[in-house]
Amino acid sequence: MKSYECPFCKRVFHRQEHQVRHIRSHTGEKPFECSYPSCKKRFTRRDELIRHVRTHLRKALVTPEQTLDVNLHKAPDSKPEGDKSTGQEADKSQNQSKDGSITDPVQAAVLALSVAYAKPTSVSLSPTDLQAQSKLIEKPRRRSASNATGSLNKKNQDPLRRFSISESAGAAAPTPSPSNSKSPPSENRKNRLQNVLSPIASNNVPDFNQNYPTESNPMFLSTPRFQNTNGQRTLTVPVSVWDARQPPTSSRSGLPLSVMYNHFPSVPIPPATVNDTSMEYYLPNAYPHPTGISLPFYPFDSGIPVSPNIPVSPSSSFVPMYPTTFPSSKPQIVNAPPAPSYFSPGSSFGAQLCANGSTLLRADTKQYGLALPKITNSNLISPNQTFNPVKSSVKALPTLEPPSSPSHATATSSLHTLFHTAPSRSYD
């Protein structure tokens, strides 16, 4: 990136105008002078000059009756009412003095503001020069017919022009009038427009295809549709909107159409088999997996926690909760009452549940879709019977008893007895 250094303070700037503005702070140069009459202030920066000239314009708009400090000659109050030219000449003489300087404060402020906004050039413009230029701009510019034709001929020399010189001259022939400007286009303009559009129409532009997707054209629809053809219902199943279109009559590659378009968009269905089941087969399946699902068998010793009252190995009376094959893709939810993970001897809920012969389902095995075996009548528990639990692999831990006398230092059961395999006990 190019840098600009100040020769006085060695300050570096990235833009040259910033360097020039900074150097003026060292030299004290003020190149921007206020061009408002009777104001000789100078400024270092252009934005400061513009801000200053705006104050002159604001004061002139607020108090327009105040005039500048120049030789001002007011027009006499007595003016003939019928002579308007004398009044206009008096206004001009009021705005300008004998030496040609502007005496109207508003006009002088506007001209000074335009000078402040103007870019610096080699030739400085005075307020009188700016006033002369503004008068030239206000004059209406009227071109003759020859100048208009010459400009059209220059434009027509461009090779990118689509119209010929004669057509352009014919377009410029009508004179602008209020009636012609609002009239509709003439016949020659329509002919020229048609000539311009003819090369576009001559190209190989395909015509509009009337076979757009509608109810009358089911071949162009992306959803399956039923049709009755010769007393037989046909289900139209297009692969996609693009593939379901009519195949072309000719093949560019030379291959037969049966090889190129080997898909068939229509599947015939006998009328007797059209029901809800067949519709589920032919319609798109919302589930990506197949409809038939076979669940594997999970043994109880595969890491799933079991209750002490349930045998570890599966018995012959094991009844699965779900069938091996589902009739549909959606799994059926079995509403089974939640069962506790253990059954106490005095629990009437467990006895009643077992007496009904229903399948027990623990809460921790519900997410795996497993069912527990039915408990037979031989294992029923009642409050009046003695508790005879099923032999389990989980050993009962002895309870810690408090010492019988204060002289004993330890309890009756130690850590060795907690982790030692106790012999099996039998209950009479």
From Swiss-Prot:
Signal peptide: none annotated. The keyword RNA-binding does not apply. Residues 67-103, 133-190 are annotated as: Disordered. One of its GO terms (cellular component) is mitotic spindle. Gene3D superfamilies: Classic Zinc Finger. Residues 145-154 have a biased composition (Polar residues). Residues 71-92 have a biased composition (Basic and acidic residues). This is Zinc finger protein rsv1.
